[in-house]
Amino acid sequence: MRTMAWVLARINKLQIHRTNIFWQQRFSYLLLIQDDIYAIACNRFSKKSGLKKIDNSNLNNRFSFITKRRLISEIRQQNQYFFLETSERMRKKRFRQGNQSFCYCINYYFRSIREIVILVLQIVLSVQLQPLLREFNECNSSQSIHSIFPFMEDHFSHRHCLADIKIPYSVHPEILIRFFRRRIQDAPFPHSLRLIVHEYKNIIVLDESIPLEIKKLSTLLWNYYIHEFESTLVSLWKKTWCFVTLYHKALLDRTQSIQKIEHIKEQSHVTKSSWIIILSGSIVPCTKKDSLYYVRYGSNFIVAVGGTKFLIHKWKYYFIIFWQYYFHSWFRPYRICIRKSSKDCLPFLGYILGFRPRIIVVQARVINDLLITSFIMKELCVIIPVFRLIQLLTKEKFCNTSGRPISKSAWTTFQDDDILNQFNHIWKNLFYYYSGCLNRSDLYQIQYILRFSCAKTLACKHKSTIRVVWKKYGSRLFPRSSFYKKQELILSNVHFHKRRFWYLDLIQMYFIADLLR
């Protein structure tokens, strides 16, 4: 850790003094052959593989400077496919050197280098993304997921068409290498990265089939891939049109992102980032002035542009050509869905999002008369996908296919308080997350399933009946928590089903809502 701290301090010092030393050309290769970096990487690999950890005192017996240089030279000179075949053959062999078994073969070195590459990328990218983090801190950004809906209600309701676009993830490995060559210009490091990305072809695919050992690298490459896409897109807009950013980049779930970028602590399971980027600006091509609104959530983004449907179709072809030219990959047209805001609905962050007309009556008082008129405006309509929620509860073994509650047999080994807290936590998070929906009363069907599933789980554990469980626990099953009292204090005179609640302290997605995406 001393080496990492020294390198980061040195890089910051060079940036402050504005010297002519290109730090990305000097430090990346040096980090690959640092003993402390190797010790951290080997300890990570040993923790995952169940092997014994390596101390710094015993490090020279395992990894010498000459061995590292020789291995990196072999990677640079040989074909990576031949190297991978050799590592597979060497994995099954054991060499003996005296009385000690020589178990750390090429495969062991390869996995260690993979961990080292992840560490180096975290160090280098953390320094490069510090200006971006400072920009987020200067902006009036919100950490809440629900802050996106007031923004969409203010701006998207005036747009006739929306483009719902899914970002392609099947990128050629050499495209990823080209991205990093722009930032890290030393030759040995991209060769080491090339060896890894060629072994795992779909390394940035958004799928749970990715091995757990490369999830951290997959997350890092995905975030950098999205960063390159958005920075290229915005810079192109600024060069082509007079693009002036009005409200730039509201970053949600900022705490988790900073922990991931600055490498504050090691996370055992890293999931895909749930950043939501909001970008709006004015575009002035020739003499016609219009506005563009861009919202990205996970692997999807929505573009709203004023004008006719013909204009949004031109933007569709623009994104197809943009992806082919800058990323050298075929952007399949079915990934772009053109939706009318007044008719079509789209899935969005576990909700069903749409717009509906709303009639507002206005009274205008004249001198001796009272005129009553009305006008129609669009209103954001957020609906809970109840049927999808029931399907997910069925998948999680809370109910059967017909929606009847069943016992959660996997939780019967827990304590009674733990079972009650688990069910109460699920219901509390669902209530918070869907508090701004119009059909919030449909959540009582979900509450019914969870309530009886909790009772049946306790009855199955104690080998009794539900009647005995009701009599024993009573109101402890789903007690009236503080989030009920909060609504009663604010809406004491108004029925809370008629008002939408957006909780601006909700900074992470619940796992069921994440599955609905």
UniProtKB/Swiss-Prot annotation:
Domain of life the protein comes from: Eukaryota
Keyword Lyase found: no
Keywords: Chloroplast, mRNA processing, Plastid, RNA-binding, tRNA processing
InterPro entries reported in the protein's UniProt record: Domain_X, Maturase_MatK, Maturase_MatK_N
Location in the cell: Plastid, Chloroplast
Xref: HAMAP family: MatK
Family of this protein: Belongs to the intron maturase 2 family. MatK subfamily.
Protein known as: Maturase K
